[in-house]
């Protein structure tokens, strides 16, 4: 057994497709998390109308958590358009991003098992 940061949810499957279409290997550690971090920064800046640190800080939780339209990998344009119209978004991303009340991200890991000499996803923790 072993573990690897990641998710097995809806967004993870979509991310694999989007990454593959863009020539990106999505199997590495923290690939989905890195994608989500960049997307959240972009969305927070759009929500606040400025591209600076304070704007990101003030808006990242509002674009990452409910309420709002769920946004998955490959839907950044949709999210940017919604925010430009004053609508709320709930960025799910590749890793089902959710922040606690104090701004910490809930993490998830995939438990792996070796069968027939290959790693197989067993479950998400």
Map each language-model feature to its residues.
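Extracytosolic ligand-binding ectodomains
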Residues: 1-125
């Amino acid at each position: 057994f072993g573990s690897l940061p990641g998710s097995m949810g809806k967004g993870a499957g979509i991310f694999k497709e989007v990454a593959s279409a863009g020539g990106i290997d999505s199997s590495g550690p923290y690939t989905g998390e890195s994608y989500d971090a960049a997307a959240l920064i972009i969305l927070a800046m759009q929500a606040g109308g400025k591209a600076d640190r304070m704007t990101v800080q003030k808006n990242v939780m509002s674009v990452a958590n409910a309420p709002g339209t769920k946004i998955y990998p490959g839907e950044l344009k949709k999210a940017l358009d919604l925010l430009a119209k004053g609508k709320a978004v709930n960025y799910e991303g590749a890793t089902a991003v959710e922040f606690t009340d104090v701004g910490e991200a809930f993490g998830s890991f995939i438990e792996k098992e070796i069968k027939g000499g290959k790693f197989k996803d067993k479950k998400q923790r």
